[in-house]
Design a protein with these regions (language model features):
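Flexible domain-boundary/linker segments
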Residues: 45-47, 59, 104, 119, ...
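N-terminal active-site segment of His-dependent metallophosphoesterases
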Residues: 108
Length: 175
C-alpha cells in the first residue's frame, strides 16, 4: 500500500475556521493648571478584546488525511485599564529651581479563556450552529483559564537645582 503521506492542500481546503475579534482601545487625558506653577494631569487607558474561534476539520478521504472529525471552539475575553494621576509643582526663585510631583497609578487586567474540543461528529459538513456536544466523543476535557491582576502605586519626587549646575533629586514609590 505504500507510505502514509499527508496531503497538506487537502487539509487546508477542507478545514473550516473562523476567528472574529472585537477590540476597543481608548486613551483619555485631562490636564489643568489651576494656579501658576501647578499642573494636575490624569490619563486613563482602556483596552477590551474579545476573540471567538470556531474550527472544524472533517474526515479527509485521501492518503494521510484525517480519519475523524474534529471541532474546536474557544472564547477569550481580556479587559485591561491603566489610570495615572499626578500633581506637579515647579517654581524658579532667582538661581534656585524647585519641583515636586505626587501621584498614583492603578493598573488592572482580567482575562478569561475557555475552550472545548470534540471529535467523531456524525456529519462531515461544518455547521456553526451544530451543538458541540451533540453525538461527539470528548477529545479532551473542556478547559477554563482565569487571570486577574491589580496594582496601585503611589509615587512622589522632589527636585532642586542651583544655577543649573548643582542638582538634587529624591523619589519614592510604593506599590
Amino acid at each position: 500500500t505504500g507510505p502514509n503521506v499527508v496531503n497538506p492542500v487537502a487539509q487546508l481546503e477542507t478545514m473550516h475556521s473562523r476567528a472574529p475579534e472585537m477590540r476597543f482601545f481608548s486613551t483619555t487625558s485631562f490636564e489643568v493648571k489651576p494656579v501658576r506653577g501647578l499642573t494636575l494631569k490624569s490619563d486613563f487607558t482602556a483596552d477590551l478584546d474579545v476573540l471567538e474561534t470556531d474550527a472544524f476539520q472533517p474526515v479527509i478521504d485521501v492518503p494521510g488525511g484525517s480519519t475523524t472529525t474534529l471541532r474546536e471552539q474557544e472564547h477569550t475575553r481580556t479587559f485591561h485599564y491603566l489610570w495615572e494621576t499626578t500633581a506637579t509643582y515647579a517654581e524658579v526663585f532667582g538661581k534656585h529651581h524647585i519641583s515636586a510631583m505626587a501621584g498614583f497609578t492603578t493598573d488592572y487586567k482580567k482575562l478569561r479563556l475557555y475552550d472545548f474540543r470534540t471529535q467523531n461528529y456524525p456529519s462531515d459538513t461544518w455547521d456553526k450552529y451544530q451543538n458541540l456536544w451533540q453525538n461527539g466523543s470528548w477529545y479532551r476535557d473542556p478547559t477554563e483559564n482565569y487571570y486577574e491582576y491589580a496594582m496601585v502605586s503611589f509615587l512622589a519626587r522632589l527636585g532642586y537645582s542651583f544655577d543649573d549646575r548643582y542638582f538634587l533629586t529624591a523619589s519614592i514609590r510604593r506599590d
